[in-house]
Amino acid sequence: MKLLFDANISWRILKLIENEFPNCLHVKNIPLNQPATDNEIWNFAKENNFTIITHDDDFEKLLLQKSIPPKVIILKSFNQNTKQIATTLLAKKEIIESFINNEELMILEIY
């Protein structure tokens, strides 16, 4: 399960979830000119089999325009610090795995 964290989520989250979510990246660590555009992030995720995780509704719009892959997880849990977001993701690991493995689903909102 490969998650690509958008710039609006701290890169520090990777260390907090690495045991349960290996092979994740933050957009600041991908080989694109920074700051990468949403389209560039989308294309990287598509070419490298990542699911994008973000607070940004712009990826929902891209998903509706382009379809999958990649899949998109939108965090609707605003005003949470990185540790709280990590705790939420760890608690919802089974839901996230099920979403990624279900070929019919395109978007997951996590509250």
For the regions a language model picked out, list residue spans one by one.
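Acidic, metal-binding active-site segment of PIN/NYN-like and related structure-specific nucleases
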Residues: 49-63
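C-terminal structural segments of small proteins and small subunits
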Residues: 70-111
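Absolute protein N-terminus
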Residues: 1-2, 111
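Glycine-rich loop at the start of a catalytic domain that most often binds anionic cofactors/ligands
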Residues: 64-69
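Residues at secondary-structure transition points
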Residues: 32-39, 57, 80, 84
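Glycine-rich nucleotide phosphate-binding loop and flanking beta-alpha elements
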Residues: 11, 59-61, 81
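N-terminal first-folded block
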Residues: 3-47
